[in-house]
Amino acid sequence: MDFTFDSDDNKNAVIKVIGVGGAGGNAVNRMIDEGVQGVSFIAANTDVQALNSNKAENKIQLGPKLTRGLGAGSHPEVGQKAAEESQQTIEDSLKGADMIFITAGMGGGTGTGAAPVIAKIARETGALTVGVVTRPFTFEGPKRSKNAAEGIAQLKQYVDTLVIIANNRLLEMVDKKTPMMDAFKEADNVLRQGVQGISDLITSTDYVNLDFADVKTVMENQGAALMGIGRASGENRTVEATKLAISSPLLEVSIDGAKQVLLNITGGPDLTLFEAQDASDIVSKAAGDGVNIIFGTSINANLGDEVVVTVIATGIDSKAEEEASKQPMRRPSRPARQEVVTPEPTKSEQPEVSKAASVDDTEVKVANTISHEAPTQSIPEVKAEKKESQDTLLDPTSVWKQDRKENNRPQPVENKEKDDDEFDSFSSDDSTSISQIETSVDDESDNDIPFFKHRRQD
């Protein structure tokens, strides 16, 4: 009896990485510079200047009619419409992929608005879709943080797995004298190591084989995820490498509570069975009871004394990530004013207290009309006043003014034939959605993440 072993499906698994916006394009450039193998790179941007300088072999100009190559102006709704305009081009570029990584910086215009649209298209092609995005620094301001929260919420609906990198944690990791380029490289390494690790898993010859079907089992429809790679050598190399792999300080989630874990150990010919057991025990203990570990090992003589541990953990209850998404949007409540008016006033004091409260109410309303954040839900009258007043703050020369006024409805896109309500949170009146377009210093820049823009020169 003859047996035929067909390994073509495994060896020919196609992985594509698409960088969206300025930060996404920078991440793609970094991966190309680092020599990541086994994947195809795509850059998508509304900014033609940034797109022309990108090193990806496939480039997509998003919304050429809408933005004329000048960027999204830090407005997510513009990035969204630009991606919808270029839907067919995006679909053609993504076809044929088994796995698609979408990377972007959340908080700006193109990355925040276009990434969810691209993720939806990617899922419709049948590919395993993974999002790897950054949350902005706190010092970038509340408006950008709020935009990021909205973009992440949209993206979650269309990706199988989502990895969120917290830029704020770069401040805790690097020395004060660390150059900015080196600091951002640490964030890019999360994506690079994850992509390279998965590529290596499905193309290498293993003693205990892992293939693309295993990757799909762990990552399909799983939500928040952790991706990490650890390297170590010496006596306790496997233990140290495994601990490094499961404790990436930049990620918003931990492995605790993971339901699915893909664990692969690569070492030289001297890799022992007990070392493999040590790695599995560490992961199992960190993840908790009920975790399903899919385990693999491979031998690479070129590693010498070094071992490489790759961990992909999914099905995580992302409470920490949810808290992180809410944190930038918090604002002080009004306890101070309430403490003033709560005490029982005397008859002689009553008119003055009432007058003070009235003046304070006026000040609060005026302050809220120029705020970049939605007012708290405990003051419904202030929220209504803010909405009414914001129309007067729109830049009268802005091409988006008329469009924005007309689009205070569930869907922001008029020419969409179907699924019109799927990308509506960028224009809704809900306090959690993005506020109306306001004139700000961000409008002077076409870069999605201004703190990333200098990285184009490397």
From Swiss-Prot:
Keywords from the UniProt entry: Cell cycle, Cell division, Cytoplasm, GTP-binding, Nucleotide-binding, Septation
Location within or outside the cell: Cytoplasm
Biased composition (Basic and acidic residues): 401-418
Domain of life: Bacteria
Family indicated by similarity: Belongs to the FtsZ family.
Keyword NAD appears in the UniProt entry: no
Record's compositionally biased regions (Low complexity): 425-439
GO biological process: division septum assembly; FtsZ-dependent cytokinesis; protein polymerization
Keyword Cytoplasm in annotation: yes
Positions that bind GTP: 22-26, 109-111, 140, 144, 188
GO cellular component, one term: cell division site
Assembly, per entry: Homodimer. Polymerizes to form a dynamic ring structure in a strictly GTP-dependent manner. Interacts directly with several other division proteins.
Entries under InterPro entries matching the protein: Cell_div_FtsZ (IPR000158), Cell_div_FtsZ_CS (IPR020805), FtsZ/CetZ (IPR045061), FtsZ_C (IPR024757), Tub_FtsZ_C (IPR008280), Tubulin/FtsZ-like_C (IPR037103), Tubulin/FtsZ_2-layer-sand-dom (IPR018316), Tubulin/FtsZ_GTPase_sf (IPR036525)
Protein's name in the database: Cell division protein FtsZ
Stretches of the chain forming a coiled coil according to its record: none
Region (Disordered): 319-458
Bias-annotated ranges (Polar residues): 368-379
SUPFAM superfamilies for this protein: Tubulin C-terminal domain-like, Tubulin nucleotide-binding domain-like
Task of the protein: Essential cell division protein that forms a contractile ring structure (Z ring) at the future cell division site. The regulation of the ring assembly controls the timing and the location of cell division. One of the functions of the FtsZ ring is to recruit other cell division proteins to the septum to produce a new cell wall between the dividing cells. Binds GTP and shows GTPase activity.
GO molecular function, one term: GTP binding
